[in-house]
Amino acid sequence: MAIVKCKPTSAGRRHVVKIVNPELHKGKPYAPLLGIKSKTGGRNNLGRITTRHIGGGHKQHYRVIDFKRNKLDIPAVVERLEYDPNRSANIALVLYKDGERRYILAPKGLSAGDQIQSGINAPIKIGNSLPMRNIPVGSTVHNVELKPGKGGQIARSAGAYVQIIAREGNYVTLRLRSGEMRKVLSECVATIGEVGNSEHMLRVLGKAGANRWRGVRPTVRGTAMNPVDHPHGGGEGRNFGKHPVTPWGVQTKGKKTRHNKRTDKYIVRRRGK
């Protein structure tokens, strides 16, 4: 993994910082595990914008990732690491002993030729997946399930991890990167180690066009709009004289947005700022 700063041959290249990983596969992805990914432009079936700042971008294939890791007690070998345009983490193509291939999230320290395994008897080793009741307290894990059998939902982006800090009865207590501590059933499956490509946060795109390649459209400030378009719009000068709000009038500084009361009892400590 190398961090490369580009030479300032133009204004668009001057600030570019790239993450170069020579271990990544340079050929095409594994075709049977590709899916069609159609663009919406942020619009719903009525043609109305439901998510702003989406549109354009390079055509992409979706890589079908195995978040469930439910091929139990069958050893697999890592064939290669690959780039995935749909996520910040890299992915690994693994070949199981029965001949099936699957994509998984590539943990930090995993490389081509390594062996991995899933199941309750899997050893505590990077890339192995097993129920958290069989993982020692203090271990670092990723791709953590919230419901048994549903597949990993927590800690899937580049550099993400969760620490198991306690085990009581049928539950384990996890400490998330945000500072939140929550309980999860010990039957839920997690993968040992942290997600790789943690240098992703250091990259600098360098120009607006690089964001457009990724399908991200510009974000216009509310104060630069007219009163019809945003609560902050209009007026002479830059002051809007009220608390900052979203375009729909909802407070935007510190207002709590969580509404899932049903699972509040599993949160031991809320995330910090």
Curated annotation (Swiss-Prot):
Keywords: Ribonucleoprotein, Ribosomal protein, RNA-binding, rRNA-binding
Gene3D superfamilies registered for this protein in UniProt: 2.30.30.30, Nucleic acid-binding proteins, Ribosomal protein L2, domain 3
PROSITE patterns documented for this protein: RIBOSOMAL_L2
GO biological process: cytoplasmic translation
GO molecular function: rRNA binding; structural constituent of ribosome; transferase activity
Pfam families tied to this protein: Ribosomal_L2, Ribosomal_L2_C
UniProt region (Disordered), positions on chain: 221-263
Function as written in the Swiss-Prot or TrEMBL entry: One of the primary rRNA binding proteins. Required for association of the 30S and 50S subunits to form the 70S ribosome, for tRNA binding and peptide bond formation. It has been suggested to have peptidyltransferase activity; this is somewhat controversial. Makes several contacts with the 16S rRNA in the 70S ribosome.
HAMAP family the UniProt entry points to: Ribosomal_uL2_B
Family per similarity comment: Belongs to the universal ribosomal protein uL2 family.
Name used for this protein in its record: Large ribosomal subunit protein uL2
Organism: Histophilus somni (strain 129Pt)
Gene this protein is translated from: rplB
